[in-house]
Amino acid sequence: MVTMEELREMDCSVLKRLMNRDENGGTAGSSGGSHGALGLLSGGKCLLLDCRPFLAHSAGYIRGSVNVRCNTIVRRRAKGSVSLEQILPAEEEVRARLRSGLYSAVIVYDERSPRAESLREDSTVSLVVQALRRNAERTDICLLKGGYERFSSEYPEFCSKTKALAAIPPPVPPSTNESLDLGCSSCGTPLHDQGGPVEILPFLYLGSAYHAARRDMLDALGITALLNVSSDCPNHFEGHYQYKCIPVEDNHKADISSWFMEAIEYIDAVKDCRGRVLVHCQAGISRSATICLAYLMMKKRVRLEEAFEFVKQRRSIISPNFSFMGQLLQFESQVLTTSCAAEAASPSGPLRERGKATPTPTSQFVFSFPVSVGVHAAPSNLPYLHSPITTSPSC
């Protein structure tokens, strides 16, 4: 077996030349994910793997790279040996190409990537390299010297970073002959309606009913579809955008988890059509945030704590009610402990079927905490609930 000391190293300048050659040839991917990786570097002959945590990758990454999944749960289950299904759960095509020897080289990087001989045996890079050597024996594996930190410093034009949203025009005061019914009785602009929808992923946005009623905001962001997670927020522009409604109340009796897979499939359908979807409820704090968290957990294979921190960095006021947090924790267990073989065979298969909606929840996912959040409560009146994730009133 080849040791870490024998792992080849690649200078940042070499990777830059490869990417520059691809750009000149028109084959480089312009975004992260498997589709970018399949077109990256010499017509898809090389694969770039980002071994950093999900939050770090989401904040900034080398264009075309694929983020591997190697969180604490994966490590604990792996007991020192991870599989391709564990580190690349949603990248079926990438796994197939690796096993078929269709990549001439795989380039791995982390935040700073010390020299190969100094890599710890239990580091993510080491575990990934070992998995590659077992499953892609004919493929050269290289370590990017200096990692993302050095490459992004020297060649920022080849990196993608989370962008601040473009300024959204302020609301236009309604005239005496024209007004817009936003479905709420509050005056002025409450906290949850200030600013615009926030980008969770390039195709996924989170906001409030007010944002969903602002066609100028939606058009400015390129929104093509809306996911309305409420039973009473109107769909204002049904002739202009695609709509889907999930009629869930924001209280401790609501079974929102029974809608997770349907919501995830809808978001994916919009993504596959190269569209963008806004997920909203009344305030964009509890119900719609819960759906976005479930999507990240399922598609990115991350823990609730990681997903929550990721979304909170973008919309600081999110606060799913206690019952929703309990359902998300149960969903986390379902997502992260499902056998890798089952994930590989059916990565988008439903974890549970959604039954007919009934006033009385029958789901085992519902945790009936004696707490509820008013559907139309203003931020100042919201009981910001404390949980293992929401630990401060500011969340």
From Swiss-Prot:
| Residues with PTM Phosphoserine | 387, 392
Q: Where does the Rhodanese domain lie? A: 42-160
- Family annotation (PROSITE patterns): RHODANESE_3, TYR_PHOSPHATASE_1, TYR_PHOSPHATASE_2, TYR_PHOSPHATASE_DUAL
> What are the disulphide bonds in this sequence?
none
User: What is the tissue localization of expression for this protein?
Assistant: Expressed at moderate levels in nearly all tissues and cells including brain, spleen, and testes with the higher expression in the heart and lung and lower expression in skeletal muscle and kidney. Undetectable in liver. Expressed in many areas of the brain with very strong expression in the hippocampus, piriform cortex, and the suprachiasmatic nucleus.
Q: What reaction(s) does this enzyme catalyze?
A: O-phospho-L-tyrosyl-[protein] + H2O = L-tyrosyl-[protein] + phosphate; O-phospho-L-seryl-[protein] + H2O = L-seryl-[protein] + phosphate; O-phospho-L-threonyl-[protein] + H2O = L-threonyl-[protein] + phosphate
Q: Which GO terms describe its biological process?
A: endoderm formation; negative regulation of ERK1 and ERK2 cascade; negative regulation of MAPK cascade; signal transduction
Q: How is it modified after translation?
A: Phosphorylation in the C-terminus by ERK1/2 inhibits proteasomal degradation and stabilizes the protein.
Q: Which Pfam families match?
A: DSPc (PF00782), Rhodanese (PF00581)
Domain Tyrosine-protein phosphatase, residue spans: 196-337
Which residues are the active-site ones?
A: 281
- Sites where N-acetylvaline occurs are at 2
**Compartment(s):** Nucleus
UniProt keyword list: Acetylation, Hydrolase, Nucleus, Phosphoprotein, Protein phosphatase
Q: Which SMART domains match?
A: DSPc, PTPc_motif, RHOD
Q: Name one GO molecular function term.
A: phosphatase activity
Which Enzyme Commission number(s) are on file for it? Answer: 3.1.3.16, 3.1.3.48
User: What does the entry list under GO cellular component?
Assistant: cytoplasm; nucleus
Induction note: By mitogens and by stress.
Check the record and name the InterPro entries matching this protein: Dual-sp_phosphatase_cat-dom, MKP, Prot-tyrosine_phosphatase-like, Rhodanese-like_dom, Rhodanese-like_dom_sf, Tyr_Pase_AS, Tyr_Pase_cat, Tyr_Pase_dom
Is the keyword Heme assigned to this protein?
no
Q: What does this protein's UniProt record list under function?
A: Regulates mitogenic signal transduction by dephosphorylating both Thr and Tyr residues on MAP kinases ERK1 and ERK2.
Protein family (similarity comment): Belongs to the protein-tyrosine phosphatase family. Non-receptor class dual specificity subfamily.
Query: What's the subunit arrangement here?
Result: Hollow spherical complex composed of 24 subunits with pseudooctahedral symmetry, has a tetramer as the basic unit.
What is this protein called in UniProt?
Dual specificity protein phosphatase 4
